[in-house]
């Protein structure tokens, strides 16, 4: 299981959503930490500009959660959770 590091902006943005949404995001991020294959490349100008070319994303409850993986899969890997954006804002 990878170590998770949450950015301040992610924590602040997530706090704006209701508890069921926050819980769904936490559950999805647990999957991300346990399974390296979860998520897709974050494509698009907004995503690349905001989170970097190497960012990945997962969709949950109408949100895109952006993150980056570093290190070899397993206990030496770190997942940096960068931000959460409503999908309607990206399209």
Each PLM stretch: what is its role?
Residues 26-36, 73, 78:
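A short beta-strand-loop micro-motif that forms or neighbors metal/cofactor-
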């Amino acid at each position: 299981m990878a170590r998770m590091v949450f950015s301040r902006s992610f924590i602040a943005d997530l706090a704006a959503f209701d508890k069921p949404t926050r819980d769904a995001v936490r559950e999805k991020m647990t999957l991300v930490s346990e399974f390296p294959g979860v998520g897709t490349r974050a494509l698009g100008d907004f995503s690349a500009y905001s989170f970097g070319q190497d960012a990945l994303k997962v969709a949950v409850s109408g949100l895109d959660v952006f993150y980056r993986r570093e290190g070899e899969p397993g206990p030496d890997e770190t997942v940096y959770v960068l931000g959460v954006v409503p999908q309607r804002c990206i399209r």
